[in-house]
Regions:
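Signal-transmission linkers at sensory-effector interfaces
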Residues: 1-33
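Helix-loop-beta substructure at the N-terminus of cytosolic sensory domains
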Residues: 19, 25-66, 74, 82, ...
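Flexible loop/coil segments at beta-strand boundaries within sensory signal-transduction domains
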Residues: 41, 57-60, 127-133, 142
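Regulatory sensory and allosteric helical modules in signal-transduction proteins
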Residues: 56, 64-66, 73-109, 117-122
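Short beta-strand-to-loop transition segments that serve as allosteric relay/switch motifs
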Residues: 71, 136-145, 166
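A short, aliphatic-rich beta-strand micro-motif
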Residues: 119-128, 135
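Amphipathic alpha-helical "output/dimerization" segments
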Residues: 129-132, 146-170
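Regulatory cytosolic signal-relay segments
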Residues: 163-197
Length: 197
């Protein structure tokens, strides 16, 4: 009974976090702030040491880190299919690695640069409503055990508000760009009329 109660409490805690992230979607168009918040929630509730979120660049197809906790060297860029993040992006399937150094796809250069020791990884694709890959969320080093299927499920749910926010921000940016273009066209037409005899 005690284990069931503990599991139920954990599920409630995680659902509350998804709701919290969902509420934040309505309060900001700042994707960097939202990404930080989502990664922070994920690392806290899954009890991971660090987390990162890689956004898919729609022009190049590569992935660029929006959040990389503990990394001060600037954004990382990963090609589709490269490393664990790129492999998850290419396959669209979440992965749990209990010993990343034993996996030939793991790239230890970030560990070497930062002095951090990656012992385990949980990497999950984030999709929009149409099922298009928009980001990859990765957690490093579970503090109190191993990453689980329940953790994968939670990260997938937590990615939904971020996907909605990204879509909303893209639409907002598109509307602002169109409106700016309309103003410029109107201004050009007014200037042209003013210059005509």
């Amino acid at each position: 009974m005690s284990d069931e109660l503990t599991e139920a409490r954990e599920r409630v805690r995680r659902l509350e976090a998804v709701v919290e992230a969902g509420l934040m979607v309505n309060s900001t168009l700042d994707l960097a702030e939202l990404a930080e918040h989502v990664v922070s929630i994920a690392t806290r509730l899954i009890d991971a040491e660090r987390g990162s979120l890689f956004l898919v660049d729609r022009k190049t197809g590569s992935l660029r880190s929006m959040v990389a906790q503990g990394l001060s060297t600037g954004p990382l860029t990963v090609e589709m299919g490269e490393g664990i993040v790129g492999a998850v992006a290419a396959s669209g399937e979440a992965e749990i690695l209990d010993d990343p150094y034993a996996d030939s796809r793991f790239e230890p250069k970030v560990d070497h640069i930062t002095g951090f020791q990656t012992r385990s990884l949980l990497t999950v694709p984030v999709r929009d409503r149409e099922g298009m890959l928009i980001a990859v969320l990765q957690l490093l080093n579970h503090r109190s055990g191993r990453f689980s299927a329940a953790d994968v499920e939670f990260l997938a749910e937590l990615g939904i508000p971020f996907a909605i926010a990204l879509t909303t921000a893209d639409l907002h940016r598109e509307i602002v760009t169109r409106e700016q273009l309309r103003r410029e066209v109107r201004l050009a037409a007014e200037i042209q009329r003013a210059l005509q005899p």
